[in-house]
Regions:
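Beta/alpha (TIM)-barrel catalytic core signal, keyed to glycine-rich beta->alpha loops juxtaposed to Asp/Glu
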Residues: 1-154
């Protein structure tokens, strides 16, 4: 299920959807082996609602990433580079040993608990090569990621 707004907005928003309701519909239609296993949503250092907005569950106790983990739904992140807006100088904070903004943007997304992988539209072989370079760096540990979130929010 590819989305833009529905899992990132408040529950009273016209486009809001509950992932729990979506799984229930999938089970009603397809049974226990329904095949609804993945969602795609925008996520990056600035479109961070998937990580920060608790809008899922009966009491809004889960973010979409927490709910997806709970339900066994994999999450792919679209716009990890925010259509190259995150690549401009001085937009992203420095962290780790990564000098390139594209690497920092990708590392943030791929280190986020609950995200399977960032999805990047690449227009040239050079972009593919640059984006593959980040795979040589291990994802951040939970502690490192938590520390980065604290740094970003301070």
């Amino acid at each position: 299920m590819a989305t833009w707004e529905c899992f990132r907005v408040a529950t009273d928003h016209a486009q809001y959807l509950s992932i729990f309701d979506m799984v229930k519909i999938a089970k009603d239609v397809g049974g226990q082996d329904h095949g609804f296993r993945f969602i795609q949503l925008p996520y990056n250092m600035y479109l961070d609602q998937a990580l920060t907005v608790k809008n899922q569950g009966d009491s809004n106790q889960y973010t979409i990433l927490e709910a997806a983990i709970h339900l066994g739904i994999g999450v792919f992140a679209s716009v990890p580079l925010m259509q190259a807006k995150l690549l401009a100088p001085n937009v992203l904070p420095e962290f780790g040993q990564m000098s390139k903004p594209s690497h920092r943007a990708m590392q943030f997304v791929r280190s986020t608990p609950g995200i399977i992988a960032p999805l990047v539209g690449q227009k040239s072989q050079a972009h593919v090569q640059e984006n593959l370079e980040v795979l040589g760096t291990p994802v951040l540990s939970e502690t490192e990621f938590s520390d980065l979130i604290k740094k970003l929010s301070s």
